[in-house]
């Protein structure tokens, strides 16, 4: 009898209610089973989830459900990264308080996530804007302050003129603010910093232990930390060219071997010498101001046009007093990196070459590529940056660059310049302390108080939390806390005199740098429960976008170490395994030059071509490129619409099935429809066979078709489990498609009453195993199918969500036959299928019976037959 069509809307709501009522996914910290902590990067509550969220959380849910089935005590929590500028922007635009806007969005997105059927422990939910959360963050801040890991200093900062706030270097992308896209300016402000540089060496060395992270991410962090070993060289200023009080320029270089190729020295716009020279020099002052319009990050420097201002100052070459080099103020040198001064060797650095060509400076090659002639070798438009031998370098000629480095260092370390060595070896790091001050309202208040008499001191712990005031106005840009007199003005905790609160709030990346720790015991009064944190950490599998490779992941690695120093955790690394998933992308569409939504168009096949038109008017629509889903290009698919049309399991199945998880997946309506047809097919096969299988005990087949059914499903159990372990979800999906194809005929026989007892036992086992294997990807369908089969696994009543992962029989997984390629005189002519344990004589005899071998021998005998066991057969005719 034909089964009723599967209704995902009814089934999914039912099973979600069952799981919630049974508290199926709540995790007990006292459970003695082996732990497994899986976590997807928690979302910013922007208003609605998108298909990228669906893919990210579906992947994490597959891992969580699979590990739960494998017997682990799984922690799979969810929360909200809820502070940030969009809430303030919404407050200004829509006249709604950031808190109200944020919590409304959380409610909407929580409903959406719940509709996906994710196996999340919602009892541990928090938002980083919850007072209970940022109270503990303020406690952490004070702990780190007392451990000397927080400092306050004046420095050049990246100022976003649109968002009116400071940005960390990592938040400046191609010279622009990471959120606003505005060109970043430099300003000098007093800021709060976390001393991440105290851990530079540790953070670098720790990357070698993270063998379950993508190498690309580790490389990005290595480059960002940027350890370099070089030489700090003092260049004496030429007599008569320098202002009073200046006698030298100190330069840090990683290439002292190229000193004889030097063409200039460049100093930062903020170098003391540059500042002195700008006094009374309007042209130089103007140039320095122009430099300050750039960001303070290396990325900003790399993208900006390289410019310099010739100061007229000269320095002497360290090895030749008669050789003078011009000193430029340059926009590509930062005071915060090295010494704020560099020497330029145009032949062997592309930036220096571009600069030298622009200002017509001499280009002298000093490293000769292997096989080149020193007399004829020259530099064109591209600097030579590889290895070779030294030339044009006097006493260094003929050395390797490495040997030349050491020779230069050795000589200059022994050379006295005004009572000190002319050079010293130095290790430098590109990493800078993390500036966390933000001039915003919607963030965690920094718990410090400023007193003219006592200085800056922490808020007493008994007075925490420092809560954000609700009665603020967003009628103009800037920080409303600066304008809130009753909140800002307080008494000094030391002297009792008039004082003021710190009005800067913390960078929102602080909030996400320790949330994974809070999930281990979010009910605690202290920031962490040390026992729970040490039990659950590190996170076994962390899943999120590669765009967080530096910012969030590096900060979290620092924060874990800082929390260890403060006694809150006992681990060094926060995330044992890291997986960076690809994006969900979609075609773009335009009508009359305007972006249009996929929901507003119709696509048809006409004469073999896809043609798009507007639904309402029939007007032609241009089908554009496939791009990341974005509201601006209107190529967004709303998960609510997909779930309403097809169900959550279809959405989950599709985003897992179409591409390797690390690559982008292209969302198509046809793909979603195909996934839904598969959902319906599984349901129909199971539901129609269920009456015949409901009361049958599961038992593997031992012969004939029943044995074939059992072999197929046991092989799938092994393979799908291996695929999930490797996060190769698309391969696991493909195997399940294949298994359903294999089982469909036998299940139809059972539905038609044509299966014998052995086949029924094999099918009952196979169907249970199929249901359990699909459960991590399509959990609602799996529960509905098992209910149709009587709600039992191996004879015991259970929810699929609580059932163990099926166990394969090794004997059924091993192939009894093997296919051997057969060559004749070294060329493959065909294959031989034979028992895996066949001896050499049996293989040779079977080969002689093959038609293509008989034809090649033409009635004769072979000279010999070479058998490579389990590999290949070669017939020598």
Swiss-Prot record:
| Superkingdom of origin | Bacteria
- GO annotation terms (biological process): leucyl-tRNA aminoacylation
Q: Which EC class, in a word?
A: ligase
Molecular function terms, GO-annotated: aminoacyl-tRNA deacylase activity; ATP binding; leucine-tRNA ligase activity
Q: Where located?
A: Cytoplasm
Q: Which UniProt keywords apply?
A: Aminoacyl-tRNA synthetase, ATP-binding, Cytoplasm, Ligase, Nucleotide-binding, Protein biosynthesis
- Positions contributing to ATP binding: 631
Question: Can the keyword Plastid be found in this entry's annotation?
Answer: no
Question: What Enzyme Commission number(s) does the record list for this chain?
Answer: 6.1.1.4
Q: Pfam families annotated for this entry?
A: Anticodon_1, tRNA-synt_1, tRNA-synt_1_2, tRNA-synt_1g
Reactions listed under catalytic activity: tRNA(Leu) + L-leucine + ATP = L-leucyl-tRNA(Leu) + AMP + diphosphate
Q: Where is this motif: 'KMSKS' region?
A: 628-632
Motif: 'HIGH' region; annotated at 43-53
Show the GO cellular component annotation of the record: cytosol
Query: Family per UniProt?
Result: Belongs to the class-I aminoacyl-tRNA synthetase family.
Protein's name according to its UniProt entry? Leucine--tRNA ligase
Q: Which organism is it from?
A: Brucella abortus (strain 2308)
Source organism lineage? Answer: Bacteria, Pseudomonadati, Pseudomonadota, Alphaproteobacteria, Hyphomicrobiales
The gene behind this protein is leuS
